[in-house]
């Protein structure tokens, strides 16, 4: 999808973000895998509601999600992801009489017309990792 966008919009910029649920293993280990599945579904629902056709989000693997933010520069993509981050922090979760909350860490990068999509994804992933190393629950732009 991203490659098709680049081909059809060679002069357009876009943002890429990768989000990861903080301590997701703890959710599974503490409350069970059904609760973990519920968490992924609720988070997906929130992401899709916020996207509302403005950008694309998909599960990237495990508890990671990838966001494709067309026609946005780094600052604009970062602002969108700050809003997503804030929405997740406010999202109440209730499963089988358990009330709990989650946080996410997000790495945001921008396509710079020189790099391949893989390079941009790698840079976003490195920013995500830096956010994890420096305390989690943040957006690294």
Give names to the regions the model predicted.
Residues 2-15, 22-49, 58-62, 66-67, ...:
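Conserved long alpha-helical elements within nucleotide-processing catalytic cores of c-di-GMP signaling
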Residues 5-6, 49-54, 86-98, 130:
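Short catalytic/binding micro-motifs of nucleotide second-messenger systems
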Residues 29, 68-72, 89, 111-112:
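Residue-level recognition of strand-loop junctions within catalytic nucleotide-signaling folds
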Residues 56-59, 100:
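A short pre-motif secondary-structure segment
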Residues 74, 78-82, 96, 109-140:
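Catalytic-core segments of nucleotide cyclases and related cyclic-nucleotide turnover enzymes
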